[in-house]
């Protein structure tokens, strides 16, 4: 609807547009897996009082202990992140939520990098980008250093997020060994429809 309105207001020929891209900071967005509604992540009680937000910004440094726990594993995938995972990445924030949220709420959450969340909001699909999953969520691309797994189940188990490996990493946006069955989305400006490619 927003795209259609922008095109109409500015008399832009839809055939001249080749794509729309989203960019965002390394922030974590959280939605309910069953209803797709935003899940409040501000804490401490996580009850939605109407003022809560479902995004933990990159500059939120609450997960100090969680980042330390992750880096203390010295897991091989950390080599691809400069030797350690930054507190500003999604995984320390997800682990912080697991350690602080009521378990029944955490168990219903699905997680996105903010740019991927914007794509999800715009399209309704569950695709994730390689940038988000590789650089911020512990996915090692198949073929890198002999990897054939992609998602690193042993890493998630070691840091206490083994429950996210169930359902083929669905809550993180993937299937076992693959980021997502369909990695990208396109918008058909002629028909005003989003399509998976």
Predicted regions and their residues:
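A glycine- and small-aliphatic-rich helix-loop capping segment at beta-alpha/alpha-beta transitions
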Residues: 32-47, 128, 147, 151, ...
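Short alpha-helix plus adjacent loop in nuclease-associated cores
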Residues: 52-70
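N-terminal glycine/serine-rich phosphate-binding loop of ATP-dependent small-molecule kinases
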Residues: 1-45, 56, 79, 107, ...
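Generic structural signal for well-ordered secondary structure
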Residues: 21-23, 48, 63, 90
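Short, well-ordered, mixed-charge alpha-helical segments that flank or form enzyme active sites
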Residues: 28-30, 66, 119-121
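Gly/Ser/Thr-rich active-site cleft segment
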Residues: 61, 71-197
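Metal-dependent phosphoesterase core characteristic of DEDDh/y 3'-5' exonuclease domains
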Residues: 49-58, 125, 129
